[in-house]
């Protein structure tokens, strides 16, 4: 029996031509950076450099920065990605040319009606949403929301106390994840849940389904390698956000909105109420008001952007405080001085706490949740003498820049003093970008910081944290697409009144 099929010459020729065409399709963009004289790792047909992500985005970016210097090019599938680390170039991309050239983020799959969410929307649609939503995130509005957030800080303390009383080490992801979910579902959807003690609540179950998300899972990798699948999936009504979950949340917002419109009493200030108010405001006449579907999309994206990030950063902060007891003690002393006898924090007292701000900023330097910032180049452009063709994704590797010894002495060390009044003026705002920069930075930055600081104050007023045998030291990062610890942070919790967990 012949090992090679006995095919006609025409068939062999057709097969050879098909293979050549397939190879050309799989590599058609891969010569771009070589042609532009930009260094970078060698791509594979179809895959580009995505196999290099097996160590995680952070390590890939750190290695490339070390090997290639200020600028390098690589390929996600066939998508050319240009990494830049020069602060002047970063400023041009994020600020100076934001509206004209670098307005949009990279599309990440079929998103359905979520294309109206502020983090995903593009061009004029994004500008309109930003104008409508910016008043929702002012310091004045945030001040009015502090009592809602503080209420869940008290729930967090109760949950931690109960965990501490068991005498076992505490997995911080559980308690901080519940706090984060409670605050965001309350402010975005107007529902009150103690999610740690009510895991069966339909809101908790649906929100958790929404958050099972990893940019390195096979679905996202397949649409990275074969981007032509995205419009096909859109036509087939397939969406990266689970439809059963978005339908549930749409109905919930509709119900809550109807209930609030029927009730003539003054409602509490939360994101949902502020968005409902903006729909009826005369001030929005220059822009088309938010539609009901757009309102739902913003509520969902607030959960999506805020849940994982808040709980992860709080876990990272507590890990650093537990492994740096001198910093923890100094922070507790500041909190006790500003708020004696465990007085509840207010918006103004939080702003008085300089050392708290330093600790949070230094943690965000070591663990920037947005490991990368990306903008799509809308047209051929030259910036700082470098030509960037239309369609290239420009990427700023925040994690690598936050640990670059050129800008930070002993970059791997946790040193809050970097952000003291005396030192912070030396920090380049385009090297330290935990929330992005420019017009398209994180719109919820103030809210996220206040949310985390209120939690930290309440927790540190009541507890001290120490490493235990289950604590992973040094902490390792997950290789997934989100910046998280490889293993959940587990610590011993001591009540400042005397109770000990994990002893």
Curated annotation (Swiss-Prot):
UniProt key word Cell wall biogenesis/degradation: no
Activity regulation info: Activated by cytochrome b5.
Cross-referenced PROSITE patterns: CYTOCHROME_P450
CDD domains linked to this entry: CYP3A
Outcome, altering residue 222 to P: In allele CYP3A4*2; exhibits a lower intrinsic clearance toward nifedipine
Superkingdom in the source lineage: Eukaryota
Binding site for heme: 442
Keywords linked to the UniProt accession: Disease variant, Endoplasmic reticulum, Fatty acid metabolism, Heme, Iron, Lipid biosynthesis, Lipid metabolism, Membrane, Metal-binding, Microsome, Monooxygenase, Oxidoreductase, Steroid biosynthesis, Steroid metabolism, Sterol metabolism, Transmembrane, Transmembrane helix, Ubl conjugation
Heme found in the keyword field: yes
Transmembrane region(s): 2-22
Enzyme Commission number(s) of this protein: 1.14.14.1, 1.14.14.56, 1.14.14.73, 1.14.14.55
Compartments where located: Endoplasmic reticulum membrane; Microsome membrane
Topology within the bilayer: Single-pass membrane protein
GO CC terms: cytoplasm; endoplasmic reticulum membrane; intracellular membrane-bounded organelle
Reactions catalysed according to its record: an organic molecule + reduced [NADPH--hemoprotein reductase] + O2 = an alcohol + oxidized [NADPH--hemoprotein reductase] + H2O + H(+); 17beta-estradiol + reduced [NADPH--hemoprotein reductase] + O2 = 2-hydroxy-17beta-estradiol + oxidized [NADPH--hemoprotein reductase] + H2O + H(+); 17beta-estradiol + reduced [NADPH--hemoprotein reductase] + O2 = 4-hydroxy-17beta-estradiol + oxidized [NADPH--hemoprotein reductase] + H2O + H(+); 17beta-estradiol + reduced [NADPH--hemoprotein reductase] + O2 = 16alpha,17beta-estriol + oxidized [NADPH--hemoprotein reductase] + H2O + H(+)
Chief site of localization: endoplasmic reticulum
PANTHER family the record matches: CYTOCHROME P450 3A4, CYTOCHROME P450 FAMILY 3
Role according to the record: A cytochrome P450 monooxygenase involved in the metabolism of sterols, steroid hormones, retinoids and fatty acids. Mechanistically, uses molecular oxygen inserting one oxygen atom into a substrate, and reducing the second into a water molecule, with two electrons provided by NADPH via cytochrome P450 reductase (NADPH--hemoprotein reductase). Catalyzes the hydroxylation of carbon-hydrogen bonds.
Assembly: Interacts with PGRMC1; the interaction requires PGRMC1 homodimerization.
Family label: Belongs to the cytochrome P450 family.
Disease the record associates with this protein: Vitamin D-dependent rickets 3: An autosomal dominant disorder of vitamin D metabolism resulting in early-onset rickets, reduced serum levels of the vitamin D metabolites 25-hydroxyvitamin D and 1,25-dihydroxyvitamin D, and deficient responsiveness to parent and activated forms of vitamin D.
Protein name: Cytochrome P450 3A4
Gene that produces this protein: CYP3A4
């Amino acid at each position: 029996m012949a090992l090679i099929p006995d095919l006609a010459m025409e068939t062999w020729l057709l097969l050879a031509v098909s293979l050549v065409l397939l190879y050309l399709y799989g590599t058609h963009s891969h010569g771009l950076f070589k042609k532009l004289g930009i260094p970078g790792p060698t791509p594979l047909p179809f895959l580009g450099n995505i196999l290099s992500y097996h160590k995680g985005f952070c390590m890939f970016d750190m290695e490339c920065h070390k090997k290639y210097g200020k600028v390098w090019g690589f390929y996600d599938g066939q998508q050319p990605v240009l990494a830049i680390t020069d602060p002047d170039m970063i400023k041009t991309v994020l600020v100076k040319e934001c509206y004209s050239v670098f307005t949009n983020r990279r599309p990440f799959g079929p998103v359905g009606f979520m294309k109206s969410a502020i983090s995903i929307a593009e061009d004029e649609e994004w500008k309109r949403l930003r104008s409508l939503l910016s008043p929702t995130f002012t310091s004045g509005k945030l001040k009015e929301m502090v009592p809602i957030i503080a209420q869940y800080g008290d729930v967090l303390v109760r949950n931690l106390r109960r965990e501490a009383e068991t005498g076992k080490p505490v997995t911080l992801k559980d308690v901080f994840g519940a706090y984060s979910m409670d605050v965001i579902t309350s402010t975005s959807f107007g529902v009150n849940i103690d999610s740690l003690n009510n895991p069966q609540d339909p809101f908790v179950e649906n929100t958790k389904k929404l958050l099972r998300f990893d940019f390195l899972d096979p679905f996202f990798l397949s649409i990275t390698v074969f981007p032509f699948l995205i419009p096909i999936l859109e036509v087939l009504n397939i969406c990266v956000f689970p439809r059963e979950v978005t339908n549930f949340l749409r109905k919930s917002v509709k119900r809550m909105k109807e209930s609030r419109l029927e009730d003539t009493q003054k409602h509490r200030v939360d994101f949902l109420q502020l968005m409902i108010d903006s729909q009826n405001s005369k001030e929005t006449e220059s822009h088309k008001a938010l539609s009901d579907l757009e309102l739902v999309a913003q509520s969902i994206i607030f959960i999506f952007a805020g849940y994982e990030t808040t709980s992860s950063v709080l876990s990272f902060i507590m890990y650093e405080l537990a492994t740096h007891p001198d910093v923890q003690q100094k922070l507790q002393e500041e909190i006790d001085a500003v708020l004696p006898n465990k007085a509840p924090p207010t918006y103004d007292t939080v702003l008085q706490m300089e050392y708290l701000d330093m600790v949070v900023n230094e943690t965000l330097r070591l663990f920037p949740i947005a490991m990368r910032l990306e903008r799509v180049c809308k047209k051929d452009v030259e910036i700082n003498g470098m030509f960037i063709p239309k369609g290239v994704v420009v990427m700023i590797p925040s994690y690598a820049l936050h640990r670059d010894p050129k800008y930070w002495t002993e970059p791997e060390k946790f040193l809050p003093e970097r952000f003291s009044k005396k030192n912070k003026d030396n920090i380049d705002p385009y090297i330290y970008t935990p929330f992005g920069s420019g017009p398209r930075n994180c719109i919820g930055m103030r809210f996220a910081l206040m949310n985390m600081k209120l939690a930290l104050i309440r927790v540190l007023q009541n507890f001290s944290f120490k490493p235990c045998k289950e604590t992973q030291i040094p902490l390792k990062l997950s290789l997934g697409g989100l910046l998280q610890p490889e293993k959940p942070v587990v610590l011993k919790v001591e009540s400042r009144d005397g109770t000990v967990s994990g002893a």
